[in-house]
Amino acid sequence: MLTLDKIYHAKFVLKQVARKTDLIAATRLCPGTDLYLKTENLQVTGSFKVRGAYYKISQLSAEERAKGVIACSAGNHAQGVALAATRMGIKSVVCMPDGAPIMKVESTKRLGAEVELVKGTYDDAHDRAVELQEQTGMIFIHPYDDELVIAGQGTIGLEILDQLPDVDAVIVPIGGGGLISGVAFAIKSLRPEVKIYGVQAAGAPSMEHAFHDHKYETLDSAVTFADGIAVKTPGETTFDMVSQYVDEIVTVSEDEIAAAILALMENQKLVAEGAGATPVAAALFGKLPLAGKKTVCLISGGNIDVNILSRVITRGLVMSGRKTNLMIALEDKPGQLSLVSDIVSACGANVVSVHHDRSDANMAITSCFLKLGLETRDAAQIETIKQKLTEAGFKLVTERT
């Protein structure tokens, strides 16, 4: 049974490995909201996961340590297990979905674990890890549905109360539910009036469904670039704890997550992975009643693949009206591009790419499509540009795929 004493013991044990991460004010991020960020993206291994993994492994007996440990993970728990096991001289094996970010896979290997890539999702990696555990007798370190792992994650709740004693609300990402279970238990045990909100990706809402339907269930699929929370089945223990200690769970879209990552980079100079940005997405897009509340967004991790980050930045720019493409039907004659460019320039936007398409079979011989890539200020400026182009006699067309 999880107790507050166990979380305090985890806090003592973790002093030797985990950082007490900063809690920073984020006044520029969400104007009108008293927002703070708990920066677990700056934690050892770049994620909160080292807390639960290290505490769990530290409590193994000598006999259990001799057997080695095995885990399943989309990446962050893997790194926590690898670091903890290596520091304690224990063999570690981690099963990871083959779609896990390359940087997380390579980091896990560098930290000393043997990695087996499994085709499919986190749940498939979990099934393979259980199979190997039964074959080898190694000790399975569950990423979330384990009392000691939850106790380790709960130390974040103690830190939040220490750093912001008058906190009113805490927003936490949810995958399997280990993080929010520990944080909610710790905070509600000491300050039961504090609101605990959970956030999931709209493409992987397993705990959100379970919470609102009051029953434990497995999704058919979990599709989101926020790989750290792409979980089809919530934990049994965590479901019970979430049902008891969490006040509300909401979901955010892929575009909203991308916009939150971009906002964190631009306004706070922080890099968050998809899962870590979900609390900020919930705050930015008004998913929760935060007015008048001192609110902490728990940035759970920052381990995002740079290739994915590049695409996320582009998506975030489009979502915020900072980047757009326009397709214009033109007469194919001198001066047309110059006229379009003058209008765009007069509106204060910047042309970053130009492409003429004369290959459409349905197009008149004397016509072409002009595709412009623009850097813009916001959605209102984009609409102004479209209006000015239309007033000048240019025909805007839907971009073809």
Question: Residue spans of the language-model regions?
Answer:
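PLP-dependent amino-acid enzyme catalytic core
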Residues: M1-T401
